[in-house]
Amino acid sequence: MKLDQIHQIAVYARDLDEAISFYRDKLGARFLHKFDPPGLVFFDFSGVRVLLEKTGPKATLYFWVDDIDSAYEELRSKGIEFLHAPQLIHRDDSGVFGKPGEEEWMAFFSDPSGNVLALASRRLEDV
């Protein structure tokens, strides 16, 4: 397995409205959605999602994988320690980020310098 598709980049934002104005109005990013609380704003840059958050780390790099459980197990077999197993992050009932009814799953880990990285995947909600 090779992690070669950036799915999302998370960046700290001290003021969400100021961030919306800057990224949408000045940089031309497509605004996706604002969740406040908890203090999240999402944009799309040609297929790469950018998350601005008021209470997160300075930056997090998310890698898209087709099968998060397999990718998680493969990286664990290479000695990577995860902060937690894959977990449900968002149930997309309205289709804000993809098809309605899909779930977004993530598993977070760190690089040797302590930078936060994540695996990300979507799957249909189990019925």
What positions do the PLM features span?
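Short loop/turn microsegments at loop-to-beta-strand junctions
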Residues: H7, P38, E104-W105
